[in-house]
């Protein structure tokens, strides 16, 4: 069901989108190239006692190599299989890189909730693979088959500036795969993150500033999720295959999320295409754009829920959501009658304003129609058209017809079934594209 807008609204929408397109505040990624770092010094972990026999521990050799190359140089893990049974933590490095061309296999013995691989502090850092086959295999199924989900996380970036992680595969983490905790001027791209079919196995959770993300996630929880104190993110060319879906939240008190663009997001067989989730709280979420979303077989599509029942209520009148644009969404929802494809529920005491929905084509797979359900907000579709103080209200509208020129292509790599939790997950190949008809911004390493 598509609703037309006036020329004034369309012009305003383009102005909003164009301003957000440029919202990265500067360059992202390392300040020096891998070639320049290698020219300073190269530390091969095999020279520090590592062996690609998947028996000898590689953790301490990586740590020792960082001692020599962490202040300028390249740490190289050659092709092969390596056993990782020690936490690897690198702190305050500068002008350094890890070239992971082999596969690190996590030993399931440590069960603490720490990080398998952590990069904290410092700047000009890079973790990558030169052939797109380098991987960290988390052996999560060894925990999950015993119903253990309080266990290690995989990759952690904290307090680092001018960094990148790319052309790397993260597989079967015991808990969340990739956490970016206060990273700045960073980029994660050309990655395949592949986890089990269970909650808590997040793809990427991030907060910080000036970050660019483009990659694929397979799991059953967060795909790429922005947290409190997130600013100036460009999250584009995202492939959730399948996943819990992308989100902002969950959000609590002292929330400040601004200048976030999700663009070219393809969501297959997931919980939602996009969710903003909180239950009470205080703060501000503004200048947000969700542009060019394609979805198929998803339980929910757009879900802004200010009373999300999966989190405990937090003190406060609610978060102020304003200047949020949802533009050009196509695809299908499983059952538009029982799960409204558009669901916008704002706080009763803090109505949303400037919520703009344009060109929404979400068709029903089961049932007779799509139901759009909105409450306490102004904008389009089922949102109130008022621009002044809103009184409490709810509205429901219906539809199930596509606009002229409707297109919602699928992807060749869409998984027919999700991975379970009790068997090993094979290391996937990074896909050739993360969104229909769009080539990666940078060519996948090793591709012709």
From Swiss-Prot:
Principal cellular location given in the protein's record: secreted
GO BP term, example: polysaccharide catabolic process
Cellular compartments annotated: Secreted
Glycosylation sites: 54, 92, 131, 256, 284, 323, 328
Keywords recorded for this protein, A-Z: Carbohydrate metabolism, Cell wall biogenesis/degradation, Disulfide bond, Glycoprotein, Glycosidase, Hydrolase, Polysaccharide degradation, Secreted, Signal
Protein name, entry field: Probable rhamnogalacturonase E
Keyword RNA-binding found: no
Active site: 221, 296
GO MF annotation list: polygalacturonase activity; rhamnogalacturonan alpha-L-rhamnopyranosyl-(1->4)-alpha-D-galactopyranosyluronide lyase activity
Organism: Aspergillus niger (strain ATCC MYA-4892 / CBS 513.88 / FGSC A1513)
GO terms for cellular component: extracellular region
InterPro entries, per the entry: Glyco_hydro_28 (IPR000743), Pectin_lyas_fold (IPR012334), Pectin_lyase_fold/virulence (IPR011050)
Disulfide bonds: 43-69, 223-240, 346-352, 374-382
């Amino acid at each position: 069901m598509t609703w037309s807008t006036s020329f004034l609204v369309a012009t305003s929408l383009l102005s909003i989108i164009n301003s957000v397109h440029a919202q990265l505040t500067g360059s992202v990624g390392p300040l020096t190239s891998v070639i320049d770092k290698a020219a300073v010094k190269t530390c091969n972990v095999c020279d520090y006692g590592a062996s690609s026999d998947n028996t000898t521990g590689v953790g301490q050799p990586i740590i020792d190599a960082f001692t020599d190359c962490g202040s300028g140089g390249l740490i190289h893990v050659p092709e092969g299989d390596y056993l990782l049974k020690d936490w690897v933590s690198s702190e305050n490095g500068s002008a350094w890189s890890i070239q992971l061309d082999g596969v690190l296999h996590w030993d399931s013995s440590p069960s603490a909730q720490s990080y398998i691989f952590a990069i904290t502090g410092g700047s000009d850092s890079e973790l990558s693979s030169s052939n797109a086959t380098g991987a960290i295999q988390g052996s999560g199924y060894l925990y999950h088959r015993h119903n253990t989900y309080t266990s290690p996380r995989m990759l952690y970036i904290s307090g680092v500036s001018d960094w990148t992680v790319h052309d790397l595969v993260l597989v079967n983490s015991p808990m969340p795969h990739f956490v970016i905790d206060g990273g700045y001027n960073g980029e994660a791209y050309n990655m395949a993150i592949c986890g089990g079919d269970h909650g808590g196995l997040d793809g990427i959770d991030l907060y910080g500033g000036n970050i660019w993300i483009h990659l694929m996630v397979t799991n059953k929880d967060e795909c790429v999720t922005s947290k409190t104190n997130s600013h100036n993110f460009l999250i584009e060319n995202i492939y959730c295959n399948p996943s819990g879906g992308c989100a902002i939240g969950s959000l609590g008190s002292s929330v400040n999320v601004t200048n976030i663009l999700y663009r070219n997001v393809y969501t297959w067989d997931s919980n939602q295409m996009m969710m903003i989730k909180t239950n009470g709280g205080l703060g501000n979420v503004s200048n947000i754009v969700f542009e060019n979303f394609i979805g198929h077989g998803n339980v929910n599509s757009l879900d802004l829920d200010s009373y999300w029942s999966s989190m405990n209520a937090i003190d406060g009148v609610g978060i102020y959501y304003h200047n949020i644009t949802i533009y050009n969404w196509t695809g299908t929802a499983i059952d538009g009658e029982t799960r409204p494809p558009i669901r916008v529920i704002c706080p009763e005491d803090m109505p949303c304003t400037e919520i703009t929905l344009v060109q929404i084509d979400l068709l029903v797979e089961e049932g007779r129609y799509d139901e759009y359900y909105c409450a306490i907000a102004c904008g389009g579709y089922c949102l109130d058209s008022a621009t002044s103080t809103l009184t409490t209200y709810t509205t429901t509208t219906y539809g199930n017809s596509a606009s002229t020129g409707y297109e919602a292509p699928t992807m060749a790599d869409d998984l027919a079934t999700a991975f379970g939790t009790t068997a090993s997950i094979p290391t996937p190949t990074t896909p050739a594209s993360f969104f229909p008809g769009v080539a990666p911004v940078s060519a996948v390493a090793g591709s012709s």
